[in-house]
């Protein structure tokens, strides 16, 4: 099964209603609390952590996103997007035209971060500030196409933070509802076509259900458990953790495609957060690489040094 977003009136015309016990195929981010909760979790994890300085840096970027979101709300009419997108995600990163709002967000993020920045971070922010719009657009396109270069990795978290904020704002404005339909490509976000940062096994009304968290638009989409989130095979899956079987963070590996994705279990620790806990558990990534598996996801604060397939 795949997930499509359709106009609300189309569901009503087809007589579709939400039955009792229905599994929500898609969860849009609550932007009022997303960034503040993430920043808080990053700062919690930073305490006595070997990567504490970087987690604190990431928290600062996320807090800047929260401020910029408040100061620069997106006003965009997306009423025709759902009917024009066809079988594609409505905000597909491969074809959706970016407007200059994302550059406004980037400039605002730089302005917000510069006063407290120093050293390499300050130098990177100043270089971004001096860059032409064409250079920034080219770097943004490269990131969205997963064309990574080590020499640009210092700029990537800031550019991605602006792009993510732009796409998250657009996702919140989509005038439609999601439904599960026959199809493939469940490994890609049904809103924007990007890939997950991690999977979250949830509590509450969605208790026990696995949702993949988009690393760009922050949406979450349902993916059944005990199935590889990358190739959808289920015959050769294993689960890895660093401490115990009851760990709140595990890596699900697939022997069929040779990749892994981290899963965060809210029932084990209700505080786990898709980006923060993934970033803070890099030791598990090292372990998985030693076992011969490749990461199928990308964290917005940790980009590969070279392009991936």
Curated annotation (Swiss-Prot):
Gene Ontology MF terms in the entry: ferric iron binding
GO cellular component assignments: cytosol
Biological process according to GO: protein maturation
Localization in the cell: Cytoplasm
UniProt-annotated stretches for the region Disordered: 1-22
A Pfam family of this chain: FdhE_C
Superkingdom of the organism of origin: Bacteria
UniProt keywords, alphabetically: Cytoplasm
InterPro entries: FdhE-like_sf, FdhE_C, FdhE_central, FdhE_N, Formate_DH_accessory
NCBIfam families: FdhE, PRK03564.1
Protein function: Necessary for formate dehydrogenase activity.
Family stated for the protein in its record: Belongs to the FdhE family.
PANTHER family: PROTEIN FDHE
Protein's name according to its UniProt entry: Protein FdhE homolog
Organism of provenance: Pectobacterium carotovorum subsp. carotovorum (strain PC1)
Upper classification of the organism: Bacteria, Pseudomonadati, Pseudomonadota, Gammaproteobacteria, Enterobacterales
